[in-house]
Amino acid sequence: MKRTYQPSKIKRQRTHGFRARISTIGGKRVIAARRSKGRVRLTV
């Protein structure tokens, strides 16, 4: 049986990257929440 997680840097960035987050309203909220919390890494 094939495992569910097949790592790919491109797919990771396109789905969870900064530009992907900023492009949606919900994503902007995620970034804002992480900024307010003081996270060092905002995305991925």
UniProtKB/Swiss-Prot annotation:
NCBIfam families, per the entry: rpmH_bact (TIGR01030)
A GO MF label: structural constituent of ribosome
Protein name: Large ribosomal subunit protein bL34
Coiled-coil ranges per UniProt: none
Pfam family, one: Ribosomal_L34
GO BP term, example: translation
GO cellular component: ribonucleoprotein complex; ribosome
Organism: Phytoplasma mali (strain AT)
The entry's keywords: Ribonucleoprotein, Ribosomal protein
Similarity comment: Belongs to the bacterial ribosomal protein bL34 family.
Gene3D superfamilies documented for this protein: 1.10.287.3980
